[in-house]
Amino acid sequence: MENMIRPEAVVLADNALIPPANLISPPPNQFTHELTVGQPYYYAGAPQDRPPDGTFAAGTKVVLLVYNGGRYCRVADRQGLYVETEYRGLQQL
């Protein structure tokens, strides 16, 4: 097309990809908890002196899938993202 300006193509770094083990398909459509505050999440377990893999916004609805009474739990959001985050930031719906 004439007069169309296209942005320069950019290749994302490998860490921009979500590991297949951290995606649930189909994603959940019913939720058990909501995050009361914005908080980080991790793909491969609790942090070991490394930055978080992402952050949930306050109000994000999730399904609580694994909780063994400790500081962290495993949840899935509406996009099927299966991650570990702090349990204390969750509120039951």
Region spans (language model):
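Compositionally biased, intrinsically disordered low-complexity regions enriched
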Residues: 1-2, 21
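Structured surface patches comprising rigid loops and adjacent beta-strands/short helices at the edges
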Residues: 87-93
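SH3/SH3-like beta-barrel superfamily modules
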Residues: 3-10, 17, 57-87
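Beta-loop motif signature
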Residues: 18-70
